[in-house]
Structure formats: structure tokens, C-alpha cells
Amino acid sequence: MQFNIQEIIKMIPHSYPFLLIDRVTACTPNESVTAIKNVTFNEPFFIGHFPGNPIMPGVLIVEAMAQACIICTMSSMQNYSVYLMSIELAKFRKPVIPGDTLILTVNVVHKRKNTCKFECHAHVEGTLVAEAQILAMTKQNEA
């Protein structure tokens, strides 16, 4: 499965400037997702991080990974929400700068009842720039 931005907006409860997924190029529901974030000079976070030396904040790379995890889960569910429970083993290996295309891959490595553990990686031009493990839970929305 692939998703364009209009389909992504229906799955993720975020909006500009906090929606950090532009496109999903591959999705196997509840198993894996490959998503793209086009990093442009116009990103609002570059104003202060850092003037004259713009670098995408690591916390926003992890947020993009978490949003890819939401898509992995929500692509097969309706009337549910996904909540972040923990981030572990986050590592930032190279800076992400304007003009980069961030390729995010998330894979479910453990699932139990309403929780999923994801192994997440971010690459730019084939080079690993960040990685983390994310634990998330699903909860049915109240009517």
C-alpha cells in the first residue's frame, strides 16, 4: 500500500507544522512502513535550530518515526487512537539538513494485545542518520 498526503492526514491527528510525513511508499499494515519526509529550508524549526547552520532537531526525527508508527497501525484500524508509551535506544548518527530526503522505515518487532514495539530507522541517501525503538499503544475512541 502507498498513501499520499491527503490519506496521511486522515490517519494522523497532526497538522502543519507538526505533520512530518509527506508520503508513504510502502505499508504492510501492522508489520512495516516506509515513509518520506522532504526536508526543506522553509521548515519553521530551521529559524532557530540553528541560525546559519540549519539542522533538523533530533527530537523531530524521532517524531517523524513515531508518525510512521501511527500509519503502520492506523492503516488497518478505524475509530482508534495511537499513543506513544516510550522511546528507547535513540541514536543520532548524522545531521539532517535542508534539501535532504528523510527515508523512514518502521518495523513491528513485538506485538501484544494493544501494544506494539517498533524498530525505527531514518536514512538520507542510503546513510543511517537516526534510529530508535518506539513502544506505542492503541485505544478505541469513545463514541
From Swiss-Prot:
Protein name stated in the entry: 3-hydroxyacyl-[acyl-carrier-protein] dehydratase FabZ
Organism of this sequence: Ehrlichia chaffeensis (strain ATCC CRL-10679 / Arkansas)
Tagged with keyword Lipid metabolism: yes
Protein family: Belongs to the thioester dehydratase family. FabZ subfamily.
EC number, as in UniProt: 4.2.1.59
Catalytic residue positions: 49
Pfam families found in the cross-reference section: FabA
Single annotated GO MF: (3R)-hydroxyacyl-[acyl-carrier-protein] dehydratase activity
Gene Ontology process terms (BP): fatty acid biosynthetic process; lipid A biosynthetic process
Catalytic activity: a (3R)-hydroxyacyl-[ACP] = a (2E)-enoyl-[ACP] + H2O
HAMAP family according to UniProt: FabZ
Gene Ontology cellular component terms for the protein in this record: cytoplasm; membrane
Function of the protein: Involved in unsaturated fatty acids biosynthesis. Catalyzes the dehydration of short chain beta-hydroxyacyl-ACPs and long chain saturated and unsaturated beta-hydroxyacyl-ACPs.
Subcellular location, record wording: Cytoplasm
Keyword Lyase recorded: yes
Xref: InterPro entries: FabA_FabZ, FabZ, HotDog_dom_sf
Listed Gene3D superfamilies: Hotdog Thioesterase (3.10.129.10)
Alphabetical keyword list: Cytoplasm, Lipid A biosynthesis, Lipid biosynthesis, Lipid metabolism, Lyase
